[in-house]
């Protein structure tokens, strides 16, 4: 029963399985002399899913999802140190995307898995942004980075929080389905803390007000976003984006949070059995590892927002040795990048070990962390890179400790001298 003649000359098509006409269903798909409707396709999928063994379904759901170990191994290629944070992130991201697969395949399941958004706490230049970027690149999902300090409540001068979702859509060429599985990294989240831990009667459009607006996005809402190119006329529909499955990673330096944590731990550590350790003996990293939700609330984040970010990972302040490793070891290491740039001119680059340590020391002194490494090396090589394209017979550029500490020009080795050596 594929087609029947109606009262008119046109033929009415029917589903070969359930017998419904093309007017009773949304879609009728044609095969060789047979037709199947969208309702029968859904029914067939349901039967196959029900008959699939639980273990096989789980394996299928995980087939192309990297394991926590694989995620961490990939992070190791780009991020030096921060082992506890990388392990915690790997598990959280794996569970998040495993939850999405489960949600798609097990509709009607009585167990509802909640989303675990992530909060990264650590000093400037410790790798918070790089961790989020590397995760998104590895998982091949849309990624956008937003600065919390530019956000204001809707209706005020500044950037609306829903602009974040619009940027996410732009990053994947307005593919709504892909955007709804993306990653959003919100930097400087600590800068929108409310001015006191007591609710204020005055408007705080860039503090608590923004937190309330972000809360809706993070916990899951339907965000209205203008279509690509903006609305051409007032009646054109907005795109509706469900943020329920978007993974939000928030990061901040949280300067001053260590005092809040110390006040709490000192208050609870009174008595004969209490362990005594002076403030001078504890690094900020050690203190941050003891952070509790109540500390973040005391710092100025609203309780609802803290509750939506159950995974809290603290990043360590980078040591001199770690900064030297960052200069040379990752796939996108600064030294490797400058070596490649000079090789394009037919010149080798050598940076002496003492010079690497000098760069690390200067970055520590500036309190810029890994972020400051590139600018220090660039500053020492800028004149050389300006002159190299016009220079002849230069074989190698050597950066010594004095190049960094005393601003002396790098040593240039010429081809004739190189041959004699």
Curated annotation (Swiss-Prot):
PROSITE patterns: CLPX_ZB. GO terms for cellular component: HslUV protease complex. Zn(2+) binds at residues 15, 18, 37, 40. InterPro entries: AAA+_ATPase (IPR003593), ATP-dep_Clp_protease_ClpX (IPR050052), ATPase_AAA_core (IPR003959), Clp_ATPase_C (IPR019489), Clp_protease_ATP-bd_su_ClpX (IPR004487), ClpX_bact (IPR046425), P-loop_NTPase (IPR027417), Znf_CppX_C4 (IPR010603). GO terms for molecular function: ATP binding; ATP hydrolysis activity; ATP-dependent protein folding chaperone; protein dimerization activity; unfolded protein binding; zinc ion binding. Residues 3-56 form the ClpX-type ZB domain. Belongs to the ClpX chaperone family. Component of the ClpX-ClpP complex. Forms a hexameric ring that, in the presence of ATP, binds to fourteen ClpP subunits assembled into a disk-like structure with a central cavity, resembling the structure of eukaryotic proteasomes. ATP-dependent specificity component of the Clp protease. It directs the protease to specific substrates. Can perform chaperone functions in the absence of ClpP. This is ATP-dependent Clp protease ATP-binding subunit ClpX. It comes from Variovorax paradoxus (strain S110).
């Amino acid at each position: 029963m594929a087609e029947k003649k109606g009262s008119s000359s046109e033929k009415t098509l029917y589903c070969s399985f359930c017998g419904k006409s093309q007017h009773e269903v949304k879609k009728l798909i044609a095969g060789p002399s047979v037709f199947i409707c969208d309702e029968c396709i859904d029914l067939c999928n349901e039967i196959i899913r029900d008959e699939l063994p639980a273990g096989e379904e789980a394996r299928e759901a995980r087939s192309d999802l990297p394991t926590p170990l694989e995620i961490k191994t990939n992070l190791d290629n780009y991020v030096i140190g921060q082992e506890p944070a990388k392990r915690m992130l790997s598990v959280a991201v794996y569970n998040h995307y495993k939850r999405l697969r489960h949600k798609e395949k097990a509709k009607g399941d009585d167990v509802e898995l909640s989303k675990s958004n992530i909060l990264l706490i650590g000093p400037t230049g410790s790798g918070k942004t790089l961790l989020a970027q590397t995760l998104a690149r590895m998982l091949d999902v849309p990624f956008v980075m937003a600065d919390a300090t530019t956000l204001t409540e809707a209706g005020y001068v500044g950037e609306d929080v829903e602009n974040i979702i619009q940027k996410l859509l732009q990053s994947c060429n307005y593919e709504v389905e892909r955007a709804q599985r993306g990653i959003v990294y919100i930097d400087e989240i600590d800068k929108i803390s409310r001015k006191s831990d007591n609710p204020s009667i005055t408007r705080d459009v860039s503090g608590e007000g923004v937190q309330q607006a972000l809360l809706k996005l993070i916990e899951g809402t339907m965000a209205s976003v203008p279509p690509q190119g903006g609305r051409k006329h007032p009646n054109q529909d907005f795109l509706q984006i469900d943020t329920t499955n978007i993974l939000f990673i928030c990061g901040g330096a949280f300067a001053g949070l260590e005092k809040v944590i110390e006040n709490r731990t000192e208050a609870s550590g009174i008595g004969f059995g209490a362990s005594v350790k002076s403030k001078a003996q504890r690094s900020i990293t050690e203190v941050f590892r003891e952070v509790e939700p109540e500390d973040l609330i005391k710092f100025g984040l609203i309780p609802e927002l803290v509750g939506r970010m159950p995974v809290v990972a603290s990043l360590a302040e980078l040591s001199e040795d770690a900064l030297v490793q960052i200069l040379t070891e990752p796939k996108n290491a600064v030294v490797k990048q400058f070596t490649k740039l000079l090789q394009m001119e037919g010149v080798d680059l050598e940076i002496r070990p003492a010079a690497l340590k000098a760069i690390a020391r200067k970055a520590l002194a500036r309190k810029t962390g890994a972020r400051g490494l590139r600018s220090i090396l660039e500053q020492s090589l800028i004149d050389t890179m300006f002159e190299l394209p016009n220079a002849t017979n230069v074989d190698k550029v050597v950066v010594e400790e004095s190049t960094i500490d005393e601003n002396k020009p790098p040593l240039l080795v010429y081809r004739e001298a190189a041959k004699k050596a």
